[in-house]
């Protein structure tokens, strides 16, 4: 799976 760790 594609998981993006961005501080939104």
Curated annotation (Swiss-Prot):
Organism in which the protein naturally occurs: Homo sapiens
One GO location term (cellular component): extracellular region
Name of the protein this chain belongs to: Urine glycopeptide
Source domain of life: Eukaryota
Glycosylation sites: 1
Assigned keywords, A-Z: Glycoprotein
Lineage, opening ranks: Eukaryota, Metazoa, Chordata, Craniata, Vertebrata
């Amino acid at each position: 799976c594609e998981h993006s760790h961005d501080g939104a």
